[in-house]
Amino acid sequence: MRSLATLHQSPASCSRSAPVAPCPARRANSSRRVARQGPRARASSPVVETESEDVDITPQIDAFEELVRLAVEKDPSLATLAEQHLRSKSKSAAPVSPFAAPSPGSPSASSMLGPSLGALPNQNKPAWLRQRAPQGEIYSGLKDQLRGLKLATVCEEAQCPNIGECWNGELATATIMLLGDTCTRGCRFCAVNTARTPPPPDPNEPVNTATAVASWGVGYVVLTSVDRDDMPDGGSEHFAATVRTLKQLRPGILVECLTPDFKGDLDAVRHLARSGLDVYAHNVETVERLQKRVRDPRAGYMQTLDVLRAAKECGVYTKSSIMLGLGETDDEVIDTMLDLKAVGVDIFTLGQYLQPTPHHLPVTEFVTPEKFEYWRKFGQEEIGFRYVASGPMVRSSYKAGEFFLHSMIESDRAKARAAQEGAAGRVRPL
């Protein structure tokens, strides 16, 4: 299944070559390149200057707290709800030292990636990636409820490292995985089960999913699915039926659908995009050069862009995500951002790839929190995405990100309603 929520246990980052200088426009002779909208922005990667080899380790940046802070900064009325989210997190979060002590013989500081990580890739993870095993009464209760309704979650199937955070606290939520727990594809980064002919989907799944989600009392939910190349429409109608049922039970809930590519069937994409969902998410996963190495051969970079373009044409918010740590370069990350922006993507997330098992792709390197913060600012300020979430533990479906998107969407709709009411007030009857 194609999802950053399916990032597993392996390290990642950008290239360790020399700092990136402003780049020229992408290869002009690339005949299949997406048409650009506006000039191609470029910026140098941040350079960390050190006076000696004994450099301080970059402090951990808490992605959850940062995203909540940004939401309150944009809309101060969210302050009370923000406190509730942060209390929720503090009850379940494992204490992790904000500084990682370098080990003897660790690599020297990199001008691109900041200070030494203290460990080579595929050895001990840096401190900012260490988390306590999920536990707690709320966690266990949610797990039992999902089992009782025979619902699969990407949180478990993809071994998401944030499960202890999202399944705990006052606003516990999970990302439901539709169409079963077995994928017809075999991406080399993903831990979800695979089979050529999975069991048929449960016909009661749309109702069971909507019932469970409606009972949680959350205002924003993410639905995702495995790839089902064995189904004529790739599962688009099953997905759409779940959205329609959920909207009937909870009309005010905002629904994000993190989808497969439906084999490139754009009619299936449009069918789901028009089902009543609010955010259409489909992940590019990695840069163009690494697609064949990382994703199943039936997926593709240009196919992903076509899916996102078709969804955007239906008038919904669109979102995509990329994993770092697979051997990509800074130039390639920038090119990917530009391609996504060119097809209208509103929301972009970046997270650390974590290798789920020894049989999956190895991690090339761990990316520092400092570098992730650079990409967040670059994506919003230089590329122009509406919203960027970037951090080692950030995943496409992430509770803190949902909080920010909820506030952004509600704010947009409130402004649209006010504009309509203002226009109606200016119309005088004859």
UniProtKB/Swiss-Prot annotation:
Name of the coding gene: LIP1P
Binding-site list for [4Fe-4S] cluster 2: 183, 187, 190
Keyword Plastid attributed: yes
Organism whose genome encodes this protein: Chlamydomonas reinhardtii
Annotated Low complexity bias: 91-119
Origin organism lineage: Eukaryota, Viridiplantae, Chlorophyta, core chlorophytes, Chlorophyceae
A GO MF label: lipoate synthase activity
UniProt-annotated stretches for the region Disordered: 1-55, 85-119
Family membership: Belongs to the radical SAM superfamily. Lipoyl synthase family.
Catalytic activity: [[Fe-S] cluster scaffold protein carrying a second [4Fe-4S](2+) cluster] + N(6)-octanoyl-L-lysyl-[protein] + 2 oxidized [2Fe-2S]-[ferredoxin] + 2 S-adenosyl-L-methionine + 4 H(+) = [[Fe-S] cluster scaffold protein] + N(6)-[(R)-dihydrolipoyl]-L-lysyl-[protein] + 4 Fe(3+) + 2 hydrogen sulfide + 2 5'-deoxyadenosine + 2 L-methionine + 2 reduced [2Fe-2S]-[ferredoxin]
Amino acid composition bias (Polar residues), ranges on this chain: 1-16
SUPFAM superfamilies, sorted: Radical SAM enzymes (SSF102114)
InterPro entries membership: Aldolase_TIM, Elp3/MiaA/NifB-like_rSAM, LIAS_N, Lipoyl_synth, Lipoyl_synth_chlpt, rSAM
Entry keyword Nucleotide-binding: no
Classification via NCBIfam families: lipA, PRK05481.1, PRK12928.1
EC class: transferase
Location of this chain's protein in the cell: Plastid, Chloroplast
Domain Radical SAM core: 166-386
Transit peptide boundaries: 1-40
Name of the molecule in the record: Lipoyl synthase, chloroplastic
EC number: 2.8.1.8
Cofactor: [4Fe-4S] cluster
Alphabetical UniProt keywords: 4Fe-4S, Chloroplast, Iron, Iron-sulfur, Metal-binding, Plastid, S-adenosyl-L-methionine, Transferase, Transit peptide
A GO term from the CC aspect: chloroplast
